[in-house]
């Protein structure tokens, strides 16, 4: 019994170390959303140019998801996780020295590659570590670290943006990344997972079915709505008459609402099928989106934002939990990386379109109506997914 307890404790300690991947991804995305209006003002950028910063970063994430997801199946999860985090940390050091808009874009692409590769590999590692409904619950709990990363980004921006500036914030992020690398050196590869030299084309041929198309549609809709809404959240707050400090403060409150959303989703994952959890949360997000687009006062904006945050991030956690269960171990990293990479196409388009729409004076309520429709499409796509086969998502195939 003592040995079993020790194994569980060891697995949970490993889980906590791996879950920091979500924290760093959110820390970077959150800081970027706070930095964007500051950099835009300093360099005299149009809204469409500001949106391009986020989109170029996300293009890097797409490339990182495709490449590093496949690499994890070839050289192992642990080594790939360390490589991606090193790329993220060094990239932020260089980014802090950017001298203009063009150099900022180029460096953000490589930072994005590190981030985009880290998250699917971390999800694959946790999927290898657990089985059954516990796998879904632990993946959703891992995704709750996203909220912690956003909170850290909010507090750093609130407390330090006026003292050390956006360059200093990036250096702080890089330092935390280097610390995480030291922690990940001590984790072990999952013993039953063997690295495979499966070519990317072979992996696609083996696993590309109708379910993959439906899954990619769901990922597209989740990331299109999430990045489109949340990357512009501080800017929308500013446009509604709030100061920079008020905007950061309100955004922090909205981010806190993510945590109970995650925990309820994790609990539901132990009670009902994960695809139903996803659909419920996507429809809840759609409700929050239409509310957020049609309110004007600060109090109602924060309330609608909390509803949006509660459901949208729970849906994000649910689809992260769902994806690895659809594929066998030898292609799990590749297909999880590809699914997230395809989803990040939506993450590119979302912020870019919002910037263009704002420049063209499209109303906020119309923009959020579009997000509501996309969320409904995503929920329908997942509900249409077939149930996993007996070998799919198994602990060892």
Labelled PLM ranges:
Residues 175-193, 378-386:
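C-terminal membrane-cytosol helix-exit motif in multi-pass small-molecule transporters
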Residues 91, 102-110, 299-307:
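Paired small-residue
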Residues 63-99:
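Conserved MFS/SLC helix-loop-helix module at the cytosolic interface between two early adjacent transmembrane helices
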């Amino acid at each position: 019994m003592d040995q079993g307890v020790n194994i569980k404790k060891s697995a949970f300690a490993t889980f906590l170390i791996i879950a920091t991947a979500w924290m760093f991804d959110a820390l970077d995305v959150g800081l970027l959303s706070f930095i964007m209006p500051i950099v835009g003002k300093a360099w005299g950028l149009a809204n469409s140019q500001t949106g391009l910063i986020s989109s170029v970063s996300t293009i890097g994430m797409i490339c990182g998801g495709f490449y590093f997801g496949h690499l994890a199946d070839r050289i192992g999860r642990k080594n790939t996780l360390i490589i991606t985090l090193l790329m993220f940390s060094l990239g932020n050091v260089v980014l802090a020295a950017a001298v203009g808009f063009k150099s900022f874009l180029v460096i953000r692409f490589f930072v994005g590659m590190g981030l985009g590769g880290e998250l699917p590999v971390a999800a694959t590692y946790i999927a290898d570590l657990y089985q059954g409904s516990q796998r879904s619950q632990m993946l959703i709990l891992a995704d709750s670290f996203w909220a912690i990363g956003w909170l850290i980004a909010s507090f750093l921006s609130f407390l330090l943006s006026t003292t050390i500036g956006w360059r200093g914030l990036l250096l702080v992020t890089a330092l935390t990344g280097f610390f995480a690398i030291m922690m990940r050196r001590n984790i072990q590869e999952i013993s039953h997972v063997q690295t495979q030299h499966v070519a990317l084309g072979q992996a696609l041929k083996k696993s590309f079915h109708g379910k993959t198309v439906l899954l990619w549609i769901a990922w597209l809709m989740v990331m299109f709505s999430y990045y489109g809404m949340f990357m512009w959240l501080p800017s929308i707050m500013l446009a509604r008459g709030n100061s920079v400090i008020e905007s950061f403060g309100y955004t922090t409150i909205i981010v806190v609402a993510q945590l109970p959303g995650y925990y309820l989703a994790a609990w539901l994952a132990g009670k009902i099928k994960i695809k139903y959890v996803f659909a419920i949360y996507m429809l809840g997000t759609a409700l929050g989106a239409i509310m957020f687009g049609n309110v004007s006062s600060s109090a109602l904006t924060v309330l609608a934002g909390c509803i949006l945050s509660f459901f949208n991030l729970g849906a994000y956690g649910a689809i992260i939990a769902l994806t690895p269960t659809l594929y066998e171990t030898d292609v799990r990293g590749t297909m999880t990386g590809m699914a997230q990479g395809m989803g990040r196409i939506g993450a590119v388009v979302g912020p870019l379109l919002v910037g263009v729409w704002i420049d063209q004076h499209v109303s906020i309520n119309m923009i959020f109506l579009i997000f509501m429709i996309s969320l409904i499409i995503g929920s329908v796509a997942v509900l249409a997914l077939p149930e996993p086969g007996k070998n799919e998502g198994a602990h060892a195939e």
